[in-house]
Swiss-Prot record:
One of its GO terms (molecular function) is DNA binding. Belongs to the SfsA family. InterPro entries: SfsA, SfsA_C, SfsA_N. HAMAP family: SfsA. It comes from the Bacteria. It comes from Cyanothece sp. (strain PCC 7425 / ATCC 29141). This is Sugar fermentation stimulation protein homolog. Pfam families: SfsA, SfsA_N.
Length: 239
């Protein structure tokens, strides 16, 4: 296995009892204690919120938090037992580490990484802007995905007008700048990636149009374990 690019703090194992109101999850820890954890994922979590599944949670020592525990990952049994990242706050953090370590050769050489840079007519903020002396600026937008069909990762898993907007704004940068859509595949069992046509056909068609116009798509595979996260390289793009 590749080296960890990110290491979790000590986690606690448990069993998912239920997820409700989007932000809450009742979990029975191995000790038998039942806790309510914060669910840091507002999406539908298609296929990754089944009661009875094994989960891992982190615990905060911040006395001001209403919920001390955060649900970090869940184990699914789709094609093989696989840990799937639940915490949508992590992909951008991990991507920042990957970019700083220059682990994605497809992005070429760059000297500086800027974060949350305003751009576009629709007033977005791009996740990362890569610059270098001998290259045009490269705008990188990150999207995390956990939805799969077999070993095919899919995004989005629901209609996303915000995601559609991001594609339009990245397209508007071309060809004067480089534009990249980086899909953070938050599980290690997928070897291909495709747009989630059945969930959002408008997004899927926009992505195909953008690729034809020069948008670079990087479906990045990550292995998730209770110890940490490692980068596995690119999945094959299926358009």
């Amino acid at each position: 296995m590749a080296e960890w690019i990110y290491q979790y703090p000590p986690l606690l194992a448990g069993t998912l009892l239920q997820r409700y109101k989007r932000f809450f999850a009742d979990i029975e820890l191995e000790s038998g204690e039942v806790i309510t954890a914060h669910c840091p994922n507002t999406g539908p979590m298609t296929g990754i919120s089944t009661p009875g599944s094994r989960v891992q949670v982190s615990r905060s020592n911040n006395p001001n938090r209403k919920l001390a525990y955060t649900w970090e990952m869940i184990q699914v049994e789709d094609t093989e037992p696989t840990w799937v990242g639940v915490n949508t706050g992590l992909p951008n953090q991990v991507t920042k580490l990957v970019l700083a370590a220059h682990l994605i050769p497809e992005l070429g050489d760059y000297d500086q990484i800027r974060f949350e840079v305003p751009y576009g007519s629709e007033k977005s903020r791009v996740d990362f802007l890569l610059t270098g002396s001998d290259r045009p600026p490269t705008y990188v937008e990150v999207k995390s995905t956990t939805w799969t069909k077999g070993q095919l990762a899919l995004f989005p898993d629901t209609v996303t007008t915000r995601g559609q907007k991001h594609i339009r704004e990245l397209m508007a940068l071309l060809p004067a700048h480089q534009a990249v859509m980086l899909y953070f595949i938050n599980r290690g069992d997928c070897h291909q990636f495709a747009p989630g046509e059945s969930a959002d056909p408008v997004y899927a068609q926009l992505l195909r149009t953008a690729v034809a116009a020069g948008l670079q798509v990087l479906p990045c595979r990550f292995e998730i374990t209770p110890e940490g996260i490692c980068y596995l390289g690119l999945a094959d793009l299926v358009l």
